[in-house]
């Protein structure tokens, strides 16, 4: 995959080439438009180095400039206010002093052991991106080229990973016990559990397990929450009876998931919930939501390195909600 720059009319062409481009892995990330883009993959603490090649398009003309620089940028952009971006990382390397270009030039750059505290993310209302930015400073208008990188945040196995077990119900009508084998799952994991019916006095027609993603942006009263049902797993279709036990097995690998993100730079959060939904014969919906934590497992060869992520265990609140259908 070439690390190719863009064209700036007849003036020059800027190319950025990583030193390890041939061996470095790539990853995919969805754009705002929903298209998949492939970029080079980095982890926290890795250095970023390479060359900036500037190809002068018309060697008969001088390209005067006030300096050339490259930046490594980590940035959060809220789609509701694109004019107000927040940079949480900005490293600058000066490549050339003010002067002029009459022929092609190449400049080396290196950002040593760069801190990349968050995972790359594109959601419904927010984007967190990392990119290299080359700027040729000019009097009237700068020549700028940006190139995106993707960052993954790796984690070790959680020290504590308790199962989730609760009894919930509606008094004298429905009483069930459900259990999930863990509270924290890596992105390729399998959710294993079971549901046990202790009391059934309403006619249940359908039951499913949903994996729900909630993206929260903003602070306080200006917080916006975007909810997406990522996966649905049909547990049963028909009426259960007292004493019946139904197994659950939901494979996460086939879904587009990110790690759980909590209060990223005080701008946004991404959280995941398991939502148990029951529908009775009158189309009333009963549901119980339980938060889980998702994390990205380090590849086998990287697990000896000190990757670690703090986990916050969601606390269960044993209650079953009833949602009346619209009349």
Swiss-Prot record:
This protein's record includes keyword Transcription regulation: no
Spans annotated as Disordered: 305-327
Descriptive protein name: Vacuolar protein sorting-associated protein 26A
Its biological purpose: Acts as a component of the retromer cargo-selective complex (CSC). The CSC is believed to be the core functional component of retromer or respective retromer complex variants acting to prevent missorting of selected transmembrane cargo proteins into the lysosomal degradation pathway. Retromer mediates retrograde transport of cargo proteins from endosomes to the trans-Golgi network (TGN).
Record-level GO BP terms: intracellular protein transport; retrograde transport, endosome to Golgi
Subunit structure as annotated in this protein's UniProt entry: Component of the heterotrimeric retromer cargo-selective complex (CSC) which is believed to associate with variable sorting nexins to form functionally distinct retromer complex variants.
Keyword check for Cytoplasm: yes
Keywords: Cytoplasm, Endosome, Membrane, Protein transport, Transport
Primary subcellular site in the record, as a coarse category: cytoplasm
Cross-referenced InterPro entries: Arrestin-like_C, Vps26-related
Cellular component, GO annotation: cytosol; early endosome; endosome; endosome membrane; retromer complex; vesicle
UniProt topology in membrane: Peripheral membrane protein
Family: Belongs to the VPS26 family.
